[in-house]
Amino acid sequence: MVLSGRGMLDGGADDVGLWLGMQDFLVFCESAMYATCPLCGLFSDSPKEGRSGGGGGSEGQRTDSRLQLPTTSIVDSPGKRSLCVRASDGAGERDAGRAAAAPVRERLWLLRLCQHPRPLLQVLPRQPPPDRDVPGAVVIVVHGASRRGTVPEGIPVDEGAMPPPPPPRAKTKSRCAACGRRVGLMGFECRCGAVFCGAHPLLGQARLWLRLQGRAGRDAIARANPVVSADKVDKL
């Protein structure tokens, strides 16, 4: 880095932020007859009042144009753009302004991070465990907003006050015991417990049970009503 007598920047722009500190860089900007920006700390385009005289009108204007380091808009932090916008005369001057503002921008961004650090992990509040010392009680914990008909959070409920669970529903037979076809409402259930369809009315134990019942009934009827045989009629 080479500085002339009037404070012009003739060397590499990256050496400004490395060799000089933040305060030295601001002092250097003030010595170059330019005001510093209160937002980003960089010097603006317009020179300070009372210092732009120097050595005559035409020579002072040439000095101002030579000392000016035009840059584009500077990003101080992610998502925020600075208000210091300066016009550039050429591609070379624009690149030099960007390189000169890069170390200052990085230092300001690191300074903001150190002043307002953010936690890496979010700490969630820990809920207390339920009370296990109370015998014969159940603690119901409801997360979130309580609805109508629910128990509030942390209230012990006695087991005797809770209604008993409903009995299991009995499974009905809906298939024929002979062919396995679904019968629905058309099937009929025998006394033995089996369900049959219309094509297989009585099979297996049901037929045997009815046969035994019929035989016993016939025997009872025969005993109660003896057979009466009439005499044969002579043929004419």
Swiss-Prot record:
PROSITE patterns associated with the record: ZF_AN1
Classification via InterPro entries: AN1-like_Znf, AN1_A20_ZnFinger, Znf_AN1
Keyword Zinc-finger found: yes
AN1-type zinc-finger residues: 170-216
Transmembrane annotation, as ranges: none
Name of the protein in question: Zinc finger AN1 domain-containing stress-associated protein 13
Binding annotation for Zn(2+): C176, C179, C197, H200
SMART domains: ZnF_AN1 (SM00154)
Induction: By cold, dehydration and salt stress.
Segments of skewed composition (Polar residues): 66-75
Entry keyword set: Metal-binding, Stress response, Zinc, Zinc-finger
Molecular function, one GO term: zinc ion binding
Annotated segments matching region Disordered: 48-81, 150-173
Function in brief: May be involved in environmental stress response.
